[in-house]
Every structure is written in C-alpha cells, then in structure tokens.
C-alpha cells in the first residue's frame, strides 16, 4: 500500500516513497540512494520533507550523482534502523552519531551540543549543566531518553519536575511503549513561560527558537556529565550519515559528496540557525 510521488531536487531527481511502518522490501539500485526518513521527527525530517536533514539528503544525492529515494517511515526516528535498514527498505539514515555501532558511519559533517533555551527577558546565565541550579528556575522542559534527564537527576531537580514533564505527553503511560515530547513543544513551553528552562539538543531546537514570537536565547552546554560510577555522558556530538554495513561503496560516495557539498550543507545549517562546534 505504498504511495509514490515526485518532488524537485537541485540538479537531480528525488523519488519519495511513503511506506507503512512495517516497511516493504525493494531491490537496491546502485544509482539510487535510498534514505529512510521519519515522518514524525521535526525539524530533522517531516512528512512534507521540509526537515533540514531531508534537505541535506538532497544535497548528498546531488553531489554524488545519485537519484534520491526518500523512504518515509511513519514512526519516530529511533526506529529507522530496525524498521528501515534491517528490513532492507533503505541503506541510509541522515543524522546519526559518529561511530554508531549499528552501521557504517560517514565522516561527520557537523558537531553541536545540548543547550539551554530560555526567554531573553529572564536573563539566564550559564553554560555548564550545573548552572540549572539557580534561584527562580524550577520547571524544566526536555525530551525523554536524553541527557537532560541525567542533568536533572544530578541536580536534584528530577522528582520535583516529574508531574510537569508528564503533562507534556498528557500523562501517557510510558511503560512498554516509546513516548516522546516533540522538540517544538519543549520550545513552546519556554516561550509561553510555562517552563523556566528548556534542555535539548541544539539542532532540534534551533528552528523553533528562531521562529518564536517571544525572543528566546539558546546557550550551548560546554561540559560533560561524569557519573558516580565513572561513566562519562557527553553533551556534544558529531553528526554523520549512517549506511548499511553491506554498502561500503555507497559510504565512499557519501563521504566524497559530504566533502564536495560541505558549503551547501553549511548553508542549510546556518539557515536553520543551528550553532555548530569545531570538529574534534
């Protein structure tokens, strides 16, 4: 029950295939780059293909001289590898952590960090995770399954914030299912004054911070979390393109495209308002 439609691509062709969440196997074409893209992952990827990672996929395919097939998966992005690459409906995922062990990864094409988002009229000052411990900052909005939860736990703010955070998903039971707060909702909570501070990965916040009617400021967190058991949780991450393990030739083409198209990719990130860090 797949529906097909065509869209425009700078200098090339893009074929977007909307598939049910269970996926549908298709034969790989060496002249086609099949990218799995979530319909529920704004601002990275959307059903309308206007996410910034959708645009980066177009640039990579164009630079590599490949036809882009966007395989839209109607699930959250966390399921793209399991329900996409493992089901052989695509070979590529845009925007994975460098060195992700589930697949081959390209050279990173940008690096960013978790960030604090605050209203400008609050005058928040801080750039380390410990800086949330300030008078007047009691309510925090964040996305689940992220270092933000660890920051709140280590700051002694997690339990106090639990009921408010649960309200962001309408108190949905999180047991045995994946539950997530949209990035836009996190930023809206700060903009409206319902949350004193937002904590989330800067790339997922940037578009909504820029578009907010209430002036907001986003501050990158500069340190990392060192847990009591010695485990270090980084708060800065380099982003790469994930490629299926059995497609090393495609990875080579993607690496070359990332290099030749670096200025175009940088322009997308700048337009999105994403703050970037030097590569390690």
Regions found by a protein language model. Name each.
Residues 7-18:
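Bacterial N-terminal signal peptides
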Residues 21-23:
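Boundary at the C-terminal end of the N-terminal hydrophobic targeting segment
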Residues 39-42, 46-63, 116, 120-181, ...:
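Bilobed "Venus flytrap"/periplasmic-binding protein-like clamshell domains
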Residues 37-41, 111-123, 170-172, 210-256, ...:
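Periplasmic-binding protein-like
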Residues 65-67, 85-95, 136-139, 185-186, ...:
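Alpha-to-beta junction loops
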């Amino acid at each position: 029950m797949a529906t097909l439609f065509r869209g425009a691509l700078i200098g090339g062709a893009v074929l977007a295939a909307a598939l049910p969440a269970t996926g549908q196997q298709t034969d790989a074409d060496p002249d086609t780059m099949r990218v799995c893209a979530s319909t529920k992952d704004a601002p990275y990827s959307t059903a309308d293909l206007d996410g910034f990672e959708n645009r980066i996929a177009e640039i990579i395919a164009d630079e590599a001289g490949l036809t882009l097939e966007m395989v839209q998966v109607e699930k959250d992005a966390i399921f793209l590898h399991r329900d996409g690459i493992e089901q052989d409906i695509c070979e590529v995922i845009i925007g994975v952590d460098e060195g992700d062990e589930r697949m081959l990864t390209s050279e990173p094409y940008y690096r960013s960090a978790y960030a604090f988002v605050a209203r400008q009229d609050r005058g928040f000052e801080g750039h380390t995770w410990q800086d949330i411990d300030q008078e007047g900052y009691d309510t925090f909005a964040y996305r689940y399954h992220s270092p933000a939860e660890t920051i709140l736990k280590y700051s002694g703010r997690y339990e106090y914030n639990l009921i408010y955070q649960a309200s962001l998903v309408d108190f949905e039971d999180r047991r045995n299912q994946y539950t997530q707060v949209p990035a836009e909702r996190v930023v809206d909570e700060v903009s409206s004054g319902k949350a004193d501070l937002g904590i989330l990965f800067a790339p997922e916040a940037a578009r909504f911070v820029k578009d907010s009617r209430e002036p907001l400021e986003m501050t990158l967190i500069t340190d990392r979390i060192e847990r009591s058991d010695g485990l270090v949780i980084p708060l800065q991450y380099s982003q790469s393109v994930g490629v299926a393990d059995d497609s090393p030739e495609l990875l080579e083409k993607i690496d070359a495209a990332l290099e030749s198209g670096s200025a175009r990719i940088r322009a997308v990130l700048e337009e999105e308002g994403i703050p970037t860090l030097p590569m390690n």
